[in-house]
Structure formats: C-alpha cells, structure tokens
Amino acid sequence: FEPKRRGTDLNKALEFLLRVQSHKAVAVVVSDFIGSPAETRRTGQRQLRPQLQLLESLAQASFSMLKQVNRRHDVVAVQITDRYELELPALGRLVLCDAETGEVMEINTGDARKREAFVARQNKALAETARLFRSAGIDSVQLRTDQPYGSALAKFFETREKRRRHG
C-alpha cells in the first residue's frame, strides 16, 4: 500500500486563511482533528501506547493556530469521527495502515481489556478536544460518519444562533 498523500497539515490551511482573508469571516473547519504522531512528538504531548495510537487529542500546534484564527475570525470546528476510531471490533490480530502517513501497526483486537481501554481513551480524547475548543471560545460539533448528520448540524447552528443572539 502506498498512501496517496503524506499527511495533511491543518496549520498550513489556517495560515493561508490568515494571509488571504483580511475581513472577519466565519471559518468552518471540518477535520478529524487527529494529531499525527510526528506532530505530537514536536509539541511534547504524551504518546499513547503504539498499539492503541489511533486517535489522539487535538495536537497543541493545531490548537494554537485555531486560537489565533479565532481571534480574527469566527471559527466553527466540525469534528468528524469514524465508528472504528471510537471502538474496536473483536476481530483478533489486525494490521492497520494509516492512509495519510503510511505507518503500519499491528493490534490485537481480541483482548476485551484492550478494547475497553481503547474506547475509554478515545472518549477521553474527544472530551478533551471539546474542552479545548470551549476554553478557546470556539464553537464545535462532533459528527460521526455512521450517523445522520443533517439534524445534528441543524440543531448545532440553531443553538449557536440563539446563544449568539441572547448571549
């Protein structure tokens, strides 16, 4: 398997926005907000055990850039997660390849304790990402690829509008 890309760089997109958009704008950032292992190492965040290193909390470098953009613009973060980023099916030993980096890892999904630890870690990472957005004053919504998103987005923007009108 040869990855089509060598990763994505959210910071480059955000830096571009800061350069080209001089007037205040609503910037909707759609991402999984998963920090790459290299980005995590650069920013000093604690590494997860390699066999469970599928989802990490928002990397500090991207978060700093999002805060910077939010000072000039109105940032809305839409976090997309896949079912299998949040849970591991009991399929035994799996070899996984990261489509962005090409990194290959083997994990044993047959171990119930590892699956439970994985789910707990992923939920903690999602909660931490949402907390970081709130602390920076960035409105955010989490959507899953295996669930309908239309009503969730409508409710999010409806609630956001009410809060902005009355807040």
Question: Which residues does each PLM region occupy?
Answer:
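Von Willebrand factor
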Residues: 1-25, 37-39, 82-84
